[in-house]
Amino acid sequence: MTKRLDADDRCPVRDGLYMPAEWVSHERTWMAWPCRAEPWGSLEGLLRARVNFAAAARALSGFEKVTMVVRPEDHDEARLACGRGISFAVFDIDDSWMRDMAPLFVTDGKEGVAGVHWRFNAWGNKYHPHDNDAALGAQILDALDMRSYEGPMVLEGGSIAVDGLGTLITTEQCLLNENRNPNLTRQQIEERLAIYLGITRVVWLGEGLEDDETDGHVDNIAGFAGPGRVLIHKPPNDGGYNDRVMKDNIARLRAARDARGQPFEIIELPEPGHRDRHDGRRLDMSYINFCFTNFGIVMPAFDDAADADALRVMQGLYPDRRILQVPSLDIVEGGGGLHCITMQQPSGTPLKPERF
């Protein structure tokens, strides 16, 4: 069943809140220590991923506070691996993709910050159990003593990109997928994004990268570089799946307008060379899957010839930001990237919880 917003319902947009862009000032970045071997295919794969997670946490901590969510039984190992400068929050978790488990933070554009925790079903019930991950967003907001709103649909942070000015980019493959919100129409999904994130324009791309088990998360193919500017995963011009999909997505972006009615400036980042995962599916490497930090950017390196090209593009876009590349192959082996394992909390004072 679907629920319409009633006149007396409390929601972020009625409280003057909206989701800001990722490049605004951060209070911290949230991460989660890897604990499920299944995405990496083996315990050895999980252990290699932990090395990459720890390196990413250390890189991020050079710019801002990093809080690592960790299971009680993994706390000592995680602290030893990450070293100084990382704080830890102990929760029961099932997996480590913080972008999709964490709340989406909203702000009043001044000092106040609140959060929206959405329903989570492990990317269409692909992994079990996931009850702890589904509860994590609300638990984080409770631990922060921050006002919390419950988003009335399944939504993962990696499935959307926002510019903080009312524009949101997503994919039809993910948000319209029957394994997410089968009882919601496109219009009803857009209404919920408007009400809970302050979105006034949704730009619908088509599909994501080949063999993406998240069903086309946008954070592997497109993201805002700034107001009116979109970074896009470059079509490889080989006639393959990614080539076809990304040419279609670029055509959609060129035809679209943002919430201000302006066209997008499109900047391409190269596609790394083809590699396969442990299970034979394509390894979805993407330079789009990077993290904004305070005064910097942390982006992936794949031991690929395109690493240097991607870095040059980013340095040209952000001459005033310090840009670090960190090894990410063993993260991507599990199905996600640097952006997928992080969630930014914008700077500000937590709005106090209200009982409604």
Q: How should each PLM-predicted stretch be described?
A:
Residues T2-F356:
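The feature marks the mature, well-folded catalytic cores of soluble enzymes
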